[in-house]
Amino acid sequence: AVIDRVEELDAVLARFFSKVNKLDIAPKIDFIVTSDHGMATFVPDKYVNLGDYLPRDSFKFVFDGVPTVLYPKPGYTDTAYEILKKVPNITVWKKEEVPARYQYGSNARIGDLIVLPDVGCMVQFRDKGKPWLGGAHGYDNFDPTMQAIFYASGPSFKKNVTHPSLPNISLYPLICRLLKIK
């Protein structure tokens, strides 16, 4: 699952850097490898089928995933909310209750209920068949597994330094400085 993709990418990057390091200009090149988010492998025991708790036909639309966004039919929001508060491995908020740090929920297109699974949990409405169990992102962005990777090397970077986690937005000024853009 997730670890397999990481190992695959590691091998690709190793081949790439091996070839680049053979070039005469290699000592002059700065490299940055980053991602927009982390990934977590699903834990089958943490799977939540919302169909076990709620009738699917009580919703106008459901966006499965992480987070899961529910658009209840009129008059069903409070009922669904009270039921979902008791479901293990998830946190549910009414749209207006989503904590500000998530920067999510204020847009008119967001559904009335937002379900954030615990890391490794998958939430879906399924009638039959096996759930998709690979990996996902979109969990609590304060969880270490959701942090983006950042690797940098080259003449502009100190060697053998481990930097604390940083938000991706801080990469913009760094890249501008490297490219001498003001």
Positions of PLM-derived features:
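Acidic carboxylate-rich catalytic motifs and surrounding loops in phosphoryl-/glycosyl-chemistry enzymes
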Residues: 29-30, 96
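Acidic active-site catalytic centers that drive phospho-/nucleotidyl reactions
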Residues: 10, 36, 170
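Short, well-ordered beta-to-alpha junction loops that form the rim of enzyme active sites
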Residues: 1, 35-37, 117-120
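Active-site neighborhoods of enzymes that stabilize oxyanions during catalysis
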Residues: 61-162, 166-174
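A long, amphipathic alpha-helix that forms part
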Residues: 1-29, 175
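Acidic/histidine-rich catalytic neighborhood
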Residues: 28-29, 35-73
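Sec/Tat-exported extracytoplasmic proteins
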Residues: 17-24, 74, 84-88, 178-182
